[in-house]
Amino acid sequence: MSTNCFSGYKDLIKEGDLTLIWVSRDNIKPVRMHSEEVFNTRYGSFPHKDIIGKPYGSQIAIRTKGSNKFAFVHVLQPTPELWTLSLPHRTQIVYTPDSSYIMQRLNCSPHSRVIEAGTGSGSFSHAFARSVGHLFSFEFHHIRYEQALEEFKEHGLIDDNVTITHRDVCQGGFLIKKGDTTSYEFGNNETAASLNANVVFLDLPAPWDAIPHLDSVISVDEKVGLCCFSPCIEQVDKTLDVLEKYGWTDVEMVEIQGRQYESRRQMVRSLNDALERLRDIKRHKLQGVERRKRMFNNTIDSNDEKVGKRNEDGVPLTEKAKFNPFGKGSRIKEGDSNYKWKEVTKMEAEIKSHTSYLTFAFKVVNRSRDDEKVNEILRSTEK
């Protein structure tokens, strides 16, 4: 049974489960459930024993100390998308708008064997691990390699379908040999791992130095897809030259601009509303001038403020809540049928997407035709 906590779904929270506690939209905390521990927030403390046994997605509420108010959090099951929002950042990460598009363009499936160069914080590694057959991830920085290895073991990825190796692929290539610093487990007579990759993702400062090393580790019997993740257009330019030199085709560069839009209703303001607003401004201006004149003539006393507005006979007016379409007055509930509304949208203020250029290319190493296999495919389609 797989120990990968990102590969399936569970109904109930159990002892030792990795959970993601949603405090707010910008504050999601990964927490391992242990009955004797407590999750502390600025709103209050949430004992783990009160969370264990509840269904995933539950709202956990507590009474705040010294008041009758309640604080609450939601306990969610980890997914690669939520992990991207909550993980500890060791480097810049690939956010979901980019990662989902890359996997779709490279036709990732349980059949895929993927090379990822540049493990970093492991955001994309978790997305790959959920969807592909096997992931070979490479990280040149030793401390980040050890941190990622420990994290992958804790999440059950190493025991499932992920291999991570400490290697500068720009200098040493992608071959995994016995004696290398890697999580790969070699067989008795095995001296090198067979990668046979059909998907390659390069998140490197200089992908053009790594591309020449790919021919020895990619599949020769099927179409191989490649994506280079580059922040600068100058990197793309250098990468294109090397891709052409080493026989990669169908090259295309894409930039993802993922944005979320908030939908709401806004009241339609008429010309009469605008005219009334101008009259109101003028009326208040004249009242202010009149009040300053009376103050100058010492005709206003200390009780004048309390009396407020009066009519022509000097009788105080009763204040009524009036609707003002320009922001002042009584509050009107959005969608009130007594007023006219229109649908509007507003783009989110903060865009959580690491802006980079995605360079896609494909390569077929063995272009010879296997007539026997072609005939077999044709016969199967005729049926």
From Swiss-Prot:
An annotated GO cellular component: nucleus
Organism this protein belongs to: Saccharomyces cerevisiae (strain ATCC 204508 / S288c)
Protein known as: tRNA (adenine(58)-N(1))-methyltransferase catalytic subunit TRM61
Biological role: Catalytic subunit of tRNA (adenine-N(1)-)-methyltransferase, which catalyzes the formation of N(1)-methyladenine at position 58 (m1A58) in initiator methionyl-tRNA. GCD14 is also required for repression of GCN4 mRNA translation by the upstream open reading frames (uORFs) under conditions of amino acid sufficiency.
Localization per record: Nucleus
Binding site for S-adenosyl-L-methionine: V94, S121, G122, S123, F124, E139, R144, D168, V169, D203
Alphabetically ordered keywords of this record: Methyltransferase, Nucleus, Phosphoprotein, Repressor, S-adenosyl-L-methionine, Transferase, tRNA processing
Gene Ontology BP, a term: tRNA methylation
Gene3D superfamilies, per the entry: 3.10.330.20, Vaccinia Virus protein VP39
Main location: nucleus
Assembly: Heterotetramer; composed of two copies of TRM6/GCD10 and two copies of TRM61/GCD14.
Alphabetical list of InterPro entries matching this protein: SAM-dependent_MTases_sf, TRM61_C, tRNA_MeTrfase_Gcd14
Catalysed conversion reaction: adenosine(58) in tRNA + S-adenosyl-L-methionine = N(1)-methyladenosine(58) in tRNA + S-adenosyl-L-homocysteine + H(+)
Enzyme nomenclature, EC number: 2.1.1.220
Note: Present with 7220 molecules/cell in log phase SD medium.
Domain of life of the native organism: Eukaryota
